């Protein structure tokens, strides 16, 4: 690579980094300033963080929203990883005549937008009496086609010789999965956990539909409630967005290596 191309590449990377970091910096500045300072375009962190936090706690049930969001995200992550990893493993390891047909159905399901099945899903949840429960939030997403495809792709690198040796030693199929497949596929589980947790935490439309009581409020719903029809406290709103963003940012930073390895198909 010539010197000019290196300079151009670094310039593009610097610009991309700035465009990625600036919204976070602006959000941090907004969380520490008053609404007047934000409207005036102040780009220096202020001293109103505590005041904005007191206003947020006084106007919204922050603790309840955080607890509900963590509960929903953790439950969805655990159940989705279990179901999708077993399904992906089964699609690749076991051979059956109906496997190709089922895979075609799975691929077709990936093409359906959520809004196309949202009303039927809500009617099902209402018929089963699950509205306003965590089950209504978790059940429609436990068999995500993308996650099944991810684990199926990862299963292709799982050596068949190990499976046959384990069977000869008398290990059950569930034993092979939990004692051999799961430890080897740590990177894939890390990537799947990151994506699932972030999707569950940031979900707004479906929780807004199935959670119809104030006791079931989540963090995205709380942030939406900070905007009234007549006035907006931008400092409090920015702080709410910042608090809502922190858990997913921490999860991604902790699992970024596993995320990269899992998405690219690395097995360690």
Predicted regions and their residues:
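Short, Lys/Arg-rich, polar N-terminal cytosolic tail immediately upstream
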Residues: 1-3
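A structural signal for multi-pass alpha-helical bundles of membrane permease subunits
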Residues: 5-268
């Amino acid at each position: 690579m010539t010197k000019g191309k290196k300079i151009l590449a670094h310039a593009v990377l610097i610009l991309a980094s700035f465009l990625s970091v600036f919204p976070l910096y602006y959000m941090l500045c907004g969380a520490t300033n008053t609404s007047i300072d934000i409207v005036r375009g102040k780009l220096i962190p202020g001293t109103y963080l505590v005041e904005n936090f007191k206003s947020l706690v006084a106007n919204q049930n922050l603790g309840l929203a955080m607890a509900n969001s963590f509960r929903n995200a953790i439950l969805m992550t655990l159940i989705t990883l279990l179901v999708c990893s077993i399904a992906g493993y089964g699609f690749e390891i076991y051979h059956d005549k109906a496997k190709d047909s089922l895979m075609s159905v799975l691929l077709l399901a990936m093409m359906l937008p959520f809004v196309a099945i949202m009303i039927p899903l809500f009617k099902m949840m209402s018929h089963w009496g699950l509205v306003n429960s965590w089950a209504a939030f978790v059940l429609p997403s436990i068999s995500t086609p993308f996650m099944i495809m991810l684990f199926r792709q990862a299963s292709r690198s799982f050596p068949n010789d190990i499976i046959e040796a384990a069977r000869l030693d008398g290990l059950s199929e569930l034993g092979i999965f939990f004692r051999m497949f799961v430890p080897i596929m740590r990177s894939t589980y890390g990537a799947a956990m990151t994506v699932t947790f972030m999707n569950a935490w940031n979900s707004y439309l479906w929780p807004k539909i199935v959670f119809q009581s104030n006791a079931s409020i989540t963090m995205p719903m709380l942030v939406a409630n900070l905007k009234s029809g007549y006035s907006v406290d931008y400092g409090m709103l920015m702080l709410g967005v910042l608090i809502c963003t922190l858990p997913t940012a921490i999860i991604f930073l902790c699992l970024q290596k596993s995320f990269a390895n899992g998405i690219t198909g690395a097995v360690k």
